[in-house]
A protein has these predicted regions:
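Structural signature of FAD isoalloxazine-binding scaffolds in flavoprotein oxidoreductases
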Residues: 29, 36-41, 67-85, 133-163, ...
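A generic local secondary-structure boundary/capping motif
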Residues: 66, 107-110, 118-122, 135-142, ...
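Anion-binding (especially nucleotide phosphate/pyrophosphate-binding) glycine-rich loop
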Residues: 2-128
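Residue-level signal for pocket-adjacent positions within structured domains
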Residues: 15, 21-23, 30, 61-62, ...
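Phosphate/pyrophosphate- and phosphate-bearing ligand-binding catalytic cores of soluble enzymes
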Residues: 15-16, 66, 153-274, 278-298
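Short beta-strand or tight-loop elements
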Residues: 116, 146, 165-167
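Short, well-ordered alpha-helical segments in soluble proteins
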Residues: 110, 128, 132-136, 151-154, ...
Length: 298
């Protein structure tokens, strides 16, 4: 279906039968029918206008919380490139960042500008677009604490803006329709001393390194924390620490992380996650909800 789309009006790179494994931290999964990297917001709008409404659409950022199944994705995948990675320091301690901007870089630029309130982004391995979609958070703060407004494009190619209230944020969720692709966020910070903020970020970095598997093929937090409980504690209590299926393993360091070893498949990872869910439910009666986004064909 995607090969029949008239893409003469778009300027960005279009790749058919594009491998998606390189764009996922797990480094597993199949191909997308089409991968589009828009040149800018106008180019993204032009692509969306010619994309048939019945073609499934997926937007990817760093791929830090993404599991692409082995059969690949039957539809169009959009990856926001350099034009969406800008980070601008504005008056009154505000930051304007493209949806493709890496959370860690936003945190650092804000710190260097003496803007406090963004240190939590140091603990999120993703992009601003993902943080908008999921109300990304870490270390007792989340996106709704700093967002002023977000800008996006809907499936018809129409630019839309949302204030923080209209985002409908709750825990790891935004109520904005899935067909809206976020392109930019305007965020509000507060005055701070660069040295103090950078020290706070350094403490977050040390805490992550000590308690989470970094520099490994993982997908970040696998499951959302249920109310009044921590997912990792429930998983540990169910005896899942180190549990392995095929090339996938529950991290020994932090049980809410799944690790892909050499030879792992997406099926291994998903099967392991489901086995963890089964054991946790059997032990505690709590049904864990996936935080990692699983897409594509088995």
């Amino acid at each position: 279906v995607t090969r029949g789309i008239d893409i003469s009006s778009v300027r960005g790179a279009v790749v058919y039968d594009a491998p998606l494994a390189p764009y996922s931290w797990f480094k597993v999964g199949g191909k997308a029918d089409l991968l589009f990297t828009p040149e800018d917001e106008a180019d993204l709008g032009a692509f969306l206008k010619v994309l048939p409404s019945d073609v499934p659409l997926l937007v990817i950022g760093l791929g830090s919380n993404l599991l692409v199944r082995d059969g690949g994705y039957r539809g169009a995948v959009i990856r926001l490139g350099k034009a969406f990675q800008t980070i601008i320091v504005e008056p009154d301690h505000r930051i304007r960042a493209g949806a493709g901007a890496v959370d860690v870089k936003v945190a650092r630029q804000a710190a260097e500008a003496g803007i406090a309130g963004f240190s939590f982004l140091r603990g999120i391995p993703g992009t601003i677009g993902g943080a908008l979609r999921m109300n990304g958070g870490a270390y007792c703060a989340e996106m709704r604490d700093v967002l002023v407004s977000a800008r996006g494009i809907d499936r018809a190619g129409v630019i839309r803006t949302f204030d923080c209230r209209q985002m409908g944020f709750r825990y790891r969720h935004s109520a904005v329709a899935e067909d809206v692709i976020f392109t930019e966020a305007l965020m509000q910070g507060r005055p701070g001393e660069p040295e103090t903020i950078l020290a706070e970020m350094g403490a977050i970095t040390e805490a992550r390194s000590a308690t989470q598997p970094v520099n490994t093929r993982t997908g970040g937090s696998t499951f959302k924390n249920p109310q009044a409980a921590k997912a990792w504690e429930l998983i540990d209590r169910a005896g899942c620490r180190g549990l392995r299926i095929g090339g996938a393993q529950v991290s020994e360091l932090h049980t809410n992380f799944l690790i892909a070893h050499e030879g792992a498949t997406a099926s291994d990872i998903e099967a392991l996650g489901e086995e963890v869910r089964r054991r946790v439910f059997e032990q505690s009666g709590i049904s864990l909800e996936w935080e990692i986004k699983r897409v594509g064909e088995v």
